[in-house]
Amino acid sequence: MQLRAKAREFGRLHDTRLEPAVRAMYPQVAFATRDPQAVEAGGAAISKHLASLELLLSTSPLDPDHLWLCDCGFAVTFAWIEAFEAALGLPVDWPTGVRAYQARIGGFAAVSDELAAYRPAMDDYLTKAYP
């Protein structure tokens, strides 16, 4: 029961905090209408939620040798954060523990295969981010 509760806690952090902060960056993708202040504020919000995630990770009882349902959203969200860093100049502070978590879940074939299939659509979407 405790592991399910912890998995729900991770999932809720993603679904109610981190992912909405990342989603708020989509209106800033188009180069012609980008608001640099919104990008700066978005980076600060995302960084805050990544710091919260690092705190959860530091005390997590979830077995790191298994891929949990709550991990799946983070994999794609991390990919979008990195894409927005490159395309929008999004300033993000990545905690060391979160980068280690990203690498760990990216090591699962289910995640790496999905990201490989998904990335071309991301790249296509981001073409409007450049002049």
Language model regions located:
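Conserved C-terminal alpha-helical bundle
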Residues: Q2-S60, I81-A87
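Alpha-helical structural motif
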Residues: L3-K6, L18, H49, T77, ...
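Residue-level signal for nonpolar/aromatic packing positions in well-ordered secondary structure
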Residues: A7, L53, D71, I105-F108
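Acidic/histidine-enriched, glycine/proline-rich intrinsically disordered or flexible terminal extensions
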Residues: Y118-P131
